[in-house]
Amino acid sequence: MGNKVVVGTQWGDEGKGKITDMLARTADVVVRYGGGNNAGHTVIVDGKKFELHLIPSGILYPEKVNVIGNGVVVDPEALVEEMNMLKEEGISLNNLYVSETAHVIMPYHRLLDKLEEKRKGDGKIGTTGRGIGPAYTDKVARRGLRVIDLLDEDTFYEKLKLALDYQNLLLEKVYQVEPMDIKEIMAQYKEYIEVLRPHVTNTSLLLDEAIKEDKKIFFEGAQGTLLDIDYGTYPYVTSSNPTAGGVCTGTGVGPVWIDDVIGVVKAYLTRVGEGPFPTELNNDIGDKLRDKGHEYGVTTGRPRRCGWLDIPILKHAVRVNGLTELALTKLDVLSGLREVKVCTGYRYGDRLIEEFPGNIDILSGCEPVYEVLPGWDDDITGVREYGDLPENARRYVKLIEDMVKVPVTIIGVGPGRKEAIRREKEVN
């Protein structure tokens, strides 16, 4: 297998949880490298559904080591809640490790996130309100607290006091709300710290040892390429790097140790929150995709905006991630449509644009140029061999491969882990 990375190629919600669960089963170590509990993976094992937001999906297999890397911003309350949920389901947590240098989401981060969205009004970004952005802001501004800072009570108090001097100034003077009390925060977080303490370690060293022992490592991505702070539809993005480059900075593993980068692409396109979406379908087809695909956020429950597959977006993801293969998910959701459209470029004024534009104002003014393919009526959820797919479904897959020059090696035909087609990497 080698060491693999799974990344989302779109605006998140591509079905990475299922693909991760499929591939992580052959790994020895499963690692989260960025984001926070704003992400959500749904994994179905033996008919039981697990919704994970922070903990790697390898936790469902007791023989695997699971790592939350330094690039993740950790909300102790959310993490402990997730740990308790897994314990209640009989899942062991002895194989879970948390980076000592991961930054911590504090109560003021969540409050500031919501207050800032409210202040922006119509100009809001559409965050999950979980404090992710403010936590990353403090990390870059060098005033954040890391997991290791919470382990010693005196150190925690001193660093929290310094942080609150700034945060309370912001809360009182800018947002006109009551300041936060240091004793209340200390008391609340003390409980979480004791639960997390046995799991905290230098995860970069742990991963280095795994590499030296020739263990297979699987890096589990969160969100998607178009939510990347550098390569996404800025400013309608997250505050981290969900792209493959985030693996190295978010785990302490060098790029030479990454063998494959698998891009997960949904057979149609979805988006949660604000921002331009050229292929969005505000019609019956969009509603059908949403209902049939159960397109509601795992983390927020918000209905997702739905549209046709966008090739310029996928080409962009191939380039910035260095994708070596694709996993196409939810092909079954397209069954029953009379025709299926694929955006191959954009019309902007009198110009034809075939690459994804970095200028969001241009993207907002783009009209999609479609290639129209005939649909298929067959129920494909039971198909396990590529050759058994309807001809028009195979034409759809081939069009994607021909346009982005990357092979589709996994095709999801249903929500279950086993409802998928596996193909060899070399595709004619």
Swiss-Prot record:
Binding-site residues for GTP, renumbered to this chain: 12-18, 40-42, 304, 330-332, 412-414
Pfam families: Adenylsucc_synt (PF00709)
Family: Belongs to the adenylosuccinate synthetase family.
Protein name: Adenylosuccinate synthetase
Keyword Ligase among UniProt keywords: yes
Metabolic or biological pathway, per its Swiss-Prot or TrEMBL entry: Purine metabolism; AMP biosynthesis via de novo pathway; AMP from IMP: step 1/2
Annotated binding of substrate, by residue: 298-304
Keywords assigned by UniProt, alphabetized: Cytoplasm, GTP-binding, Ligase, Magnesium, Metal-binding, Nucleotide-binding, Purine biosynthesis
Cellular localisation: Cytoplasm
Gene expressing this chain: purA
UniProt keyword Transcription present: no
Organism, as annotated: Halothermothrix orenii (strain H 168 / OCM 544 / DSM 9562)
GO molecular function, one term: adenylosuccinate synthase activity
Main location: cytoplasm
